[in-house]
Amino acid sequence: MEMKNVKGTKDYLPEEQVLRNKIKRACEDTFERYGCKSLETPTLNMYELMSYKYGGGDEILKEIYTLRDQGKRELALRYDLTIPFAKVVAMNPNIRLPFKRYEIGKVFRDGPIKQGRFREFIQCDVDIVGVESVMAEAELMSMAFELFRTLNLEVTIQYNNRKLLNGILESINIPTERTSDVILSLDKIEKIGIDGVRKDVLERGISEEMADTICNTVLSCLKLSIDDFKDAFNTPLVAEGVNELQQLQQYLIALGINENAIFNPFLARGLTMYTGTVYEIFLKDGSITSSIGSGGRYDNIIGAFRGDNMNYPTVGISFGLDVIYTALSQKETISSTADIFIIPIGTELQCLQIAQQLRSTTSLKVELELTGRKLKRALNYANKENIPYVLIIGEEELSTETAMLRNMKEGSEVKVPLSSLSNYL
């Protein structure tokens, strides 16, 4: 049998997991600093849930992994963490609002594969339910900037409002049933340009006259500020979208993050579930062209799941761990899983005890040479594993209750007392 992974999946070896775990911890620490609570949901879901009309829309339906259990039930692997979160809130009406949750977990999409994007990947999500104010969006955007500062990545956030976009399309008489098609085309404008948008809407069955109107409208809007849209498109939906964008902009200025937050009137976020603010996060240096995070407001899903069709104001943000890992691995040296490596020279029993003592009395990550390698080979292993310190303990060192501490980066050695070893690290 040929040993190979399923296309779009990957094994991450221990040296890769060091960096991936660092990203996870940075996410967890940042999310919890903002008062978010951890939640875990099943990977396996009912197909009816994952294909619900208020979820990802037709584009996502094509990418859902489906299966059937022995009871002939139609099931699906989750394609995001948002729909399972909405399900949890709908099933638990006693959850105290506002509820701020985070979840880090695997999701699956049978879609195209490219740099930093696979078919099995990890999302790191935060969602807030129970807050109508765009202050929630501002806090999530601020949290995103803080997370990427922690990871030493410079980012920009593009943002828009679906009410504004829908209002513009309404004002140029795009039929309601064609709005989703046009939005999906507009969402690609930065990748395919205005000519590409025209071609795309034509392929979706839009008439040439309507396609020309769409493209002319896009060109006329590109230089407009947020405030200008009220005068350019005098509709209630545009006015509502502009008001929310103006409020959001005020919060971004107050938080000192407006400079790296860019208004993009045709950012759409293709998913049909969004009802207000939408945003996407990009690396400033452009080393990865796809977004490394995204999200927005979706006020209708929970009410639809509960069957009461009430408005449950909800906004979320999602970070792609795999694409962040790809970005960091291009610029960061992989560190070690251990702080110190103990090499016994005829002192295995005592070194076993010393390693255990260090683990229980300090925060050091300690690895012990277990295979009986000679000193040179053991040092070579520590060097390849990027372990910063090595502790060499032989009979002579034991007799004086000392050890030889080697700094692997500098190549220097010093004899240190075992009783105060942590002071030298």
From Swiss-Prot:
This is Histidine--tRNA ligase 1. It catalyses: tRNA(His) + L-histidine + ATP = L-histidyl-tRNA(His) + AMP + diphosphate + H(+). GO terms for biological process: histidyl-tRNA aminoacylation. Belongs to the class-II aminoacyl-tRNA synthetase family. Pfam families: HGTP_anticodon, tRNA-synt_His. It is an enzyme of class 6 (ligase). The keyword Protein biosynthesis applies. Signal peptide: none annotated. Homodimer. Its EC number is 6.1.1.21. One of its GO terms (cellular component) is cytoplasm. It is found in: Cytoplasm. One of its GO terms (molecular function) is transferase activity. Keywords: Aminoacyl-tRNA synthetase, ATP-binding, Cytoplasm, Ligase, Nucleotide-binding, Protein biosynthesis.
